[in-house]
């Protein structure tokens, strides 16, 4: 039993690209090993609750006659092997989760960079001058949708959903977009310390006021 478990848990998830299915399979294997460990402990419990360390000889040095020595030795051996297997699988699960998380962060960075390049390319192809900010964030509530999206105080807004420098008239434009986008992601482009940042903001009801949890003021143009 333990040799089979060891062979299935061998190998590193980093040998190839890890998928969510791979992680689910590792977790299934971990649970299977835990069930086997529990079953073997139940065998020991059925033998006078002998456990892993109690002696198998009596006070005179003779093999105990009140327990099944073969079952006890086999269960103890299985538990030791399975615990080693469990430790190995837990390490694989940890490595696989780290790899998935790192890959997700890389993909997010690539997507944002690509969106930035597309925006610049679109402006250049249309012969437009660089986008100008039309509003500014001057306060953000902790834990709000705006905070979760990554907005920061003093961010200057270049695009807010369908609102941009060309069509912005008043803050009512932003309010209208927010009201019609509850629960839906909005693409927001801001200028922060001289650099453009692409954010995804989801207007959502939360513990505070409004759907954003931030205050936006218009910029003088």
Curated annotation (Swiss-Prot):
Record's SMART domains? Answer: PDZ
- Renumbered to this chain, region (Disordered) spans 1-22, 105-127
Q: Which domain of life is it from?
A: Eukaryota
Family matches, as InterPro entries: Nas2_N, PDZ, PDZ_6, PDZ_sf, PSMD9
Polar residues bias locations: 1-11
The record's keywords, sorted A to Z, are: Chaperone
The GO biological-process annotations, alphabetized, read as: proteasome regulatory particle assembly
Basic and acidic residues bias: start-end ranges:
105-121
Q: Does the keyword Chaperone apply?
A: yes
PDZ domain residues: 108-193
Cite the Gene3D superfamilies for this sequence: 2.30.42.10, 6.10.140.1710
> Which Pfam families does the UniProt entry name for this protein?
Nas2_N, PDZ_6
Q: What's one GO-annotated cellular component?
A: nucleus
Oligomer and partners: Interacts with PSMC3. Part of a transient complex (modulator) containing PSMD9, PSMC6 and PSMC3 formed during the assembly of the 26S proteasome.
- What is the purpose of this protein? Acts as a chaperone during the assembly of the 26S proteasome, specifically of the base subcomplex of the PA700/19S regulatory complex (RC). During the base subcomplex assembly is part of an intermediate PSMD9:PSMC6:PSMC3 module, also known as modulator trimer complex; PSMD9 is released during the further base assembly process.
Supply the name of the protein.
Answer: 26S proteasome non-ATPase regulatory subunit 9
């Amino acid at each position: 039993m333990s040799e089979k478990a060891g062979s299935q848990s061998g190998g590193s998830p980093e040998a190839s690209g890890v998928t969510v299915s791979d992680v689910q399979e590792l977790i299934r294997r971990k649970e299977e090993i835990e069930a086997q460990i529990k079953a073997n402990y139940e065998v020991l419990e059925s033998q006078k609750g002998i456990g892993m360390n109690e002696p198998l000889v009596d006070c005179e040095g003779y093999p105990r006659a009140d327990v099944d020595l073969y079952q006890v030795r086999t269960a103890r051996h299985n538990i030791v092997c399975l615990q080693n297997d469990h430790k190995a699988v837990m390490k694989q699960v940890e490595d696989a989760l780290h790899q998935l998380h790192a890959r997700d962060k890389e993909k997010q960075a690539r997507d944002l960079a690509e969106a930035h390049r597309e925006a610049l390319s679109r402006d250049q192809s249309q012969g437009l001058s660089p986008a100008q900010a039309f509003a500014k964030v001057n306060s953000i509530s902790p834990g709000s949708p705006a905070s979760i999206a990554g907005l920061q105080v003093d961010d200057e807004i270049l695009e807010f959903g369908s609102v941009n420098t060309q069509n912005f008239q008043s803050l009512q434009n932003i309010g209208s977009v927010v009201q019609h986008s509850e629960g839906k992601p909005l693409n927001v482009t801001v200028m922060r310390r001289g650099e453009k940042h692409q954010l995804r903001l989801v207007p959502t009801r939360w513990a505070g006021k409004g759907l954003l949890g931030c205050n936006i003021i218009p910029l003088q143009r």
